Amino acid sequence: MKLIIAAPSPYARKVRVSLQEKKIDHEVIIDVPWNKNTLTKDKNPLGKVPILITKDKQHIFDSKVIIRYLDQIVPNPKLYPSDHENELSTLTIEAIADGICDAVVLIRLENVRVNNLISKQWIERQEEKIFNGLKYLSKDLDSKNYFVDDDFNLSLIHI
């Protein structure tokens, strides 16, 4: 398998950790999606990373889809809990973590704009998402060691 990533991508990081946890052999290809001659646009119509290329040359993109695929082809260790309630909790944490990452990326992109075009309101809105997301995630960590269940699962990788 080959994994196309942009080195700073938090979404690629989740997939890389998942591949390591499952001990799946893979080759990492670092690409810059913003470059004119990027591989990414040829492999994903949205031009986004990460992209997993399977042994049969199938292109799987979006970190959530890739990790679901990995959990199906190598069942152990299980990244998504088997029971419905814990799976739903893990998916909720995944959504919060992705929202936090999205907000961080949007702040970074906003800060590289020309000074007079930077929107302080936009940045404040993204910072509020980050704060609220972290507050949500930390609300009951004082009483337990894991976000979901009493075992390692995808919720820890997301954070």
What is the meaning of each model-derived region?
Residues 1-124:
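GST-like domain detector, emphasizing the conserved glutathione-binding G-site
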Residues 67, 157-158:
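Generic low-polarity alpha-helical segments
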Residues 97-157:
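GST-like fold's C-terminal all-alpha helical module
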